[in-house]
Amino acid sequence: VMDNEGVKLAVGASGGRRITNCVTQVINNVLDFSMSPQDAIDFPRSDCSGSYVNLDSRLDPIVVQGLKDKGHLIKLIDAVFDPTGMSGFASPIAITRNKNRLNAGVDTFHSAYAEGY
């Protein structure tokens, strides 16, 4: 994502068909809600790329019930570290640039970390 000063945000993910949902949510969280990259990644997610709508179990139960009431098939996914790397969501990374400062975020539910110098 670019702004008048150049690169503002870079986002990527591993996770096959789940990548598009994940990257879109991270971009929205950073740009629309002014979240840091880490907060944007840590925020409860959803994924509708399969037969079920995978929802982060940390989502408000009212939201979950509202989707069920509309006929969506819901699968709640617990947000816990999975050493196998298998979960119901893609595994994102993101970097923002503000002038000469870089901030990064990684998926803490997989074995990943951000490092810089």
Residues of each region from the PLM?
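Proteins synthesized as precursors that undergo proteolytic processing into mature forms
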Residues: 1-77
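Terminal-appendage/accessory-domain detector
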Residues: 35-36, 52, 57, 62-117
